[in-house]
Amino acid sequence: MQQGWLSNWLVKHEVVHRSLGFDHRGIETLQIKAGDWDSIAVILYVYGYNYLRSQCAYDVAPGGSLASVYHLTRIQYGIDNPEEVCIKVFVQKDNPRIPSVFWIWRSADFQERESYDMVGISYDNHPRLKRILMPESWIGWPLRKDYITPNFYEIQDAH
């Protein structure tokens, strides 16, 4: 499989990862271990990936793992087609912990909180990791494939 510059750099420096290929726009997707994510994130920022375009999370399969996905862009003055890379960090449902990248890209704030709220991934060292969409009293993670929808409906008075 063809590898991009980042994958080649990680191989050269003996950082365990897996290339997941390229999308239709030629953007490489890499799978990174959760324990390596904070140091790789710093490397990417130093290299010039100064913009976290988006972060999301999803449940891979019932009984399977959870994934946190980061789309990073290297924005430079005078460049019409900036470099991009996609990073996927997979964790098991029984201990879904990933280092937060809030301290590198501040735009990760609400995005990591939403991933925590909907999928249940805890982002270590996030300064305000709490629910952002659901009430604090909500039980469970609504976007997990094994989530059971509560069987209750609040009756509202029309007056």
Curated annotation (Swiss-Prot):
Protein keywords: Chloroplast, Membrane, NAD, NADP, Plastid, Plastoquinone, Quinone, Thylakoid, Translocase, Transport
Alphabetical list of Pfam families matching this protein: Complex1_30kDa (PF00329)
UniProt superkingdom: Eukaryota
First-tier enzyme category under EC: translocase
Coiled coil spans: none
Chief place where the protein resides: plastid
InterPro entries: NADH_DH_suC (IPR010218), NADH_quin_OxRdtase_su_C/D-like (IPR037232), NADH_UbQ_OxRdtase_30kDa_su (IPR001268), NADH_UbQ_OxRdtase_CS (IPR020396)
Catalytic activity: a plastoquinone + NADH + (n+1) H(+)(in) = a plastoquinol + NAD(+) + n H(+)(out); a plastoquinone + NADPH + (n+1) H(+)(in) = a plastoquinol + NADP(+) + n H(+)(out)
Subcellular location: Plastid, Chloroplast thylakoid membrane
Membrane topology label: Peripheral membrane protein
GO molecular-function term, one example from the UniProt record: quinone binding
A cellular-component GO term for this protein: chloroplast thylakoid membrane
Gene3D superfamilies: NADH:ubiquinone oxidoreductase, 30kDa subunit (3.30.460.80)
Enzyme Commission designation: 7.1.1.-
Entry's family note: Belongs to the complex I 30 kDa subunit family.
PANTHER family according to UniProt: NADH DEHYDROGENASE [UBIQUINONE] IRON-SULFUR PROTEIN 3, MITOCHONDRIAL, NADH DEHYDROGENASE UBIQUINONE IRON-SULFUR PROTEIN 3
Quaternary structure note: NDH is composed of at least 16 different subunits, 5 of which are encoded in the nucleus.
Function: NDH shuttles electrons from NAD(P)H:plastoquinone, via FMN and iron-sulfur (Fe-S) centers, to quinones in the photosynthetic chain and possibly in a chloroplast respiratory chain. The immediate electron acceptor for the enzyme in this species is believed to be plastoquinone. Couples the redox reaction to proton translocation, and thus conserves the redox energy in a proton gradient.
Protein name in the entry: NAD(P)H-quinone oxidoreductase subunit J, chloroplastic
